[in-house]
Amino acid sequence: MVDQRIKFRHLQTFVEVARQKSVIRAAEILHVSQPAVTKTIRELEDVLGVSLLEREGRGIRISRYGEVFLRHAGATMTALRQAVDSVSQEAARAGPPVRVGALPTVSVRIMPKAMSGFLAEKTGSPVKIVTGENAVLLEQLRVGDLDLVVGRLAAPQKMAGFSFEHLYSEKVRFVVRAGHPLLSPGLSVFDHLHEYPVLMPTRQSVIGPVVEQFLIANGVPALPIRIETVSDAFGRAFLRTSDAIWIISEGVVAADVADGILAILPVETGDTSGPVGLTVRADTQPSLPLSLLMQAIREAAGELFDGRTEG
């Protein structure tokens, strides 16, 4: 039986602190004072008999008890949000909202066609599609702000409480503008990599560690001109006006390469291949509109790759 001392405000406050990794930022978002947030967390810890948060330098981190509680608190918040939505939808005769986090590789390559297929179903559901780093999107999925994340499979330690469905596999590519000097026959890309600015995924991105390991394995421990970014808009614009090299998931630039605007350098990147697919919370059942969108994404991926395993 649920302890009657645990109120909605306890769950809401804890989930927000966990999401922001900061009592101060959580207080700002909840429009309450910092002491009020601290007091609410302490009340919750007293009821549970464990510490949910721990000091880490000048900040805080979630304890192992907090991680366990967050999974269930997030599920509770999601269920409550769905209950509220269902009443609103019944009154408005609209479908439940669908909130999707899409990594850049699928935002460009898969989602446009999938969305066209979904809209043809006429569910009446409002749709929100956001993009960003995988870690951020998974955190939003965990606490119920998103219903689905579409992108590369995250590291095992990040997938606790989630279910992943593989759609296809995709490599990382070394991309440059058309006419780049390194496209000349016979040149070794790795021998000349240090001569150019290199756009890299951030270390927090899902392909960041993959790229780092690949470079080290190929004798490139450090780059003198390194720019970390997850902005595909910046990457495209910068490559068009410079000799920079962009290390990025193939799907992000597939259309640019097909149009002849960008070109792929002759680097064998098979070791960077990784699964791309659908990630959902393991403890919730998708609504009918979400199920329809997931099927539309499967069909869009199937049409694009036609049975192939490499993107």
From Swiss-Prot:
One GO BP annotation of this record:
3,4-dihydroxybenzoate catabolic process
Record-annotated DNA-binding residue ranges: 23-42
Q: Keywords of this protein's UniProt record, alphabetized?
A: Activator, DNA-binding, Transcription, Transcription regulation
* Database matches in InterPro entries: HTH-type_LysR_regulators (IPR050950), LysR_subst-bd (IPR005119), TF_PcaQ (IPR012787), Tscrpt_reg_HTH_LysR (IPR000847), WH-like_DNA-bd_sf (IPR036388), WH_DNA-bd_sf (IPR036390)
Gene3D superfamilies, alphabetically? Periplasmic binding protein-like II, Winged helix-like DNA-binding domain superfamily/Winged helix DNA-binding domain
Example GO CC term: the record gives: cytosol
Top-level taxon: Bacteria
Record PROSITE patterns? HTH_LYSR
| HTH lysR-type domain boundaries | 6-63
Q: Name one GO molecular function term.
A: DNA-binding transcription factor activity
Family note: Belongs to the LysR transcriptional regulatory family.
Which NCBIfam families would you find in this protein's record? TF_pcaQ (TIGR02424)
What biological function has been recorded for the protein in this entry?
Activates transcription of the pcaDCHGB operon for the catabolism of the phenolic compound protocatechuate.
What is the protein name given in its UniProt record?
Answer: HTH-type transcriptional regulator PcaQ
Question: What organism is the protein native to?
Answer: Agrobacterium fabrum (strain C58 / ATCC 33970) (Agrobacterium tumefaciens (strain C58))
